[in-house]
Curated annotation (Swiss-Prot):
Record-level GO BP terms: regulation of DNA-templated transcription
Cofactor: Zn(2+)
Gene (UniProt): yacG
Lineage: Bacteria, Pseudomonadati, Pseudomonadota, Alphaproteobacteria, Hyphomicrobiales
Keyword Transit peptide set for record: no
GO molecular function: DNA topoisomerase type II (double strand cut, ATP-hydrolyzing) inhibitor activity; zinc ion binding
Database matches in HAMAP family: DNA_gyrase_inhibitor_YacG
Protein name as annotated: DNA gyrase inhibitor YacG
Keywords: Metal-binding, Zinc
InterPro entries assigned: DNA_gyrase_inhibitor_YacG, Znf_NHR/GATA
Annotated cofactor note: Binds 1 zinc ion.
Family: Belongs to the DNA gyrase inhibitor YacG family.
């Protein structure tokens, strides 16, 4: 009999770096290597979060 997932379980998502199935130890990645690649992208500035000015901020 196949193992059943709980009713509220989220569907498994692939590794965001290489697309392979994720493993629990490195989730959401498939390996330590993909975790390190993602961390390097954040630290090197490849990934950025856009910021928009709001009315309360002073213009410089």
């Amino acid at each position: 009999m196949p193992a059943r997932k709980p009713a509220g379980a989220r569907p498994e998502k692939p590794c965001p770096i290489c697309g392979k199935p994720a493993v629990a130890a490195s989730r959401p990645f498939c390996s330590e290597r993909c975790r390190d690649v993602d961390l390097n992208r954040w630290l090197s500035g490849s990934y950025v979060i856009p910021v928009s000015k709001t009315d309360g901020e002073d213009a410089e």
